[in-house]
A protein has these predicted regions:
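Short, structured coil segments at secondary-structure junctions
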Residues: 65, 95, 115-116, 172, ...
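Active-site cofactor/substrate anionic-group-binding motifs, chiefly glycine-
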Residues: 42-43, 47-95
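Anion-binding alpha/beta catalytic cores of soluble intermediary-metabolism enzymes, centered on
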Residues: 35, 90, 97-168, 263
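Adenosine-phosphate binding glycine-rich loop
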Residues: 258-259, 265-305
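Rossmann-like adenosine-cofactor binding region
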Residues: 195-276
Length: 305
């Protein structure tokens, strides 16, 4: 495992290994054990798309592992504009021990990983969000005591979260149901890859336009914002189309009685989810947010340690 670009690229064993390491690092950190796995190492963090949770979790995680996080905004680095991605990768590999990148175009991450001889971590693209899903799987395990045989239902936009959740569920031995409106389905190539992963795992992938069908008996119920960065002009239209996909108390009743609710945040209460659900007793969103730190520490320790 040289990079973390997509969970589709990893084996089930590699995914489970990252989750086990994340849980171990979390437990030991809470017990006061310090880790210096990355002492003397520097992680360059490229952000062309801003994020509270991503920056804080990677900076704190790198520091807790004894390394140094170097923040690079779009003002500091012009990825693919002016200087080529090839030249950028070749310069950074001489000075850094790893690169984390959060950006719009997935191809930029693929190019960076191809050209740089140091590990590259995908911290989000418009296509995929693998680090978030590792945190989601970790959180599911903490609350359910297992992953194998559980069902996750995702209700909403067929976006990067839906894509990575399909990959993650397949690798973890979970069933997955995705409910999206017509014309807002998941990317066709990602779906084809995910179907291959589910065939190997022997688990079920359901793709539907019916949120009730998707959520039926689900152990984990997941949603995400209807309007991602760069889609602000479509806000009113999207809200109208997606309102039947709101995760509210009525829809949530169709899930398993002990289902947990997840959201990668930021959340917009009253739109993709109601306060009743997101602030209710079955919501685990802040455990999930915290686990970004621990899951990503496992990724950094594995790739850079």
């Amino acid at each position: 495992m040289k990079d973390l670009i997509s969970l589709h690229d990893l084996t089930s064993e590699e995914v489970k290994g990252l989750l086990e390491l994340g849980l171990k690092l979390k437990k030991e950190h809470k017990s006061g054990i310090e880790h210096h796995i990355l002492k003397g190492k520097t992680l360059g963090m490229i952000f062309t798309k801003s994020s509270t949770r991503t920056r804080v979790s990677f900076e704190v995680g790198m520091t807790q592992l004894g390394g140094y996080p170097l923040f690079l905004s779009s003002n500091d680095i012009q990825l693919g504009r002016g200087e080529s991605i090839y030249d950028t990768a070749k310069v950074l590999e001489r000075m850094l021990d790893g690169i984390m990148i959060r950006t719009y175009a997935h191809q930029d991450v693929l190019d960076l990983a191809e050209y740089a001889n140091i590990p590259v971590i995908n911290a989000l693209t418009d296509l995929l969000h693998p680090c978030q899903v590792l945190a989601d799987l970790m959180t599911t395990y903490e609350h359910k005591g297992k992953l194998e045989g559980l069902k996750l239902a995702y209700i909403g936009d067929g976006n990067n979260m839906a894509h990575s959740l399909m990959y993650g569920c397949a690798k973890a031995g979970m069933d997955c149901a995705i409910a999206t409106p017509e014309n807002y389905q998941c990317d066709a190539e990602v779906v084809a890859n995910a179907k291959d992963d589910f065939k190997k795992s022997g688990k079920e992938l359901i793709l539907t336009t019916d949120p009730v069908e998707a959520i039926k008996n689900a152990d984990v119920v997941y949603t995400d914002t209807w309007v991602s960065m760069g889609q602000e002009a479509e806000k009113a239209e999207r809200q109208k189309i997606f309102m039947p996909y709101q995760v509210n108390g009525e829809l949530f009743k169709n899930a398993a009685d002990d289902a947990v609710f997840m959201h990668c945040l930021p959340a917009y209460r009253g739109f993709e989810v109601t306060e009743e659900v997101i602030d209710g007793p079955q919501s685990v969103i802040f455990d999930e947010a915290e686990n970004r730190l621990h899951a990503q520490k496992a990724v950094m320790a594995t790739l850079m340690g």
